[in-house]
């Protein structure tokens, strides 16, 4: 199997998460360089960045910045869970369906990476910086100041919750990973 394109998943994988959105608004140029590096690494000439259409500011900014990259296309996507699922994303962006397992994206010519990965590739290649931190969303009805935090991997959730203003005493449960698939 040969890759024909790189697809960047800029769809938040879970409702209420905003880390990818913030990353695009703050690091659009770096993400696009990362996509270019990924395209070169897998020897393809076409890249796509799929962004849900409820993020018009990110779509606008990424489209403006991508004008310098004729082989990278920003693809607005309808908001539909699980739009960020790899197979759903491939179908929405390039209209190809990944067959049942053991088939994988490369079987339909796609290499899929997350927007955070594109940024991490930029940092690794251009700045020689290893991956040791990422943006994390802390949100929910009980969180006093829902926020995104650039945090080192391994940071305890309790520290992030405190940074977001803490939780009331009667909070029943803290879920790590998102409301749909988290634990």
Please report, for each region that a protein language model flagged, where it lies by residue:
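A general structural motif
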Residues: 3, 44-46, 171
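Hydrophobic alpha-helical positions that pack around
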Residues: 45-157, 163-168, 178-179
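Histidine-anchored nucleotide/phosphate-binding helix
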Residues: 25-41
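Short alpha-helix boundary/capping segments
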Residues: 19-30, 152
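Gly-rich Lys/Arg/Thr-decorated short loops/hinges at beta-loop-alpha junctions or inter-strand turns
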Residues: 6-20, 142
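Conserved "landmark" site that anchors the functional core of diverse proteins
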Residues: 1-3, 21-24, 42
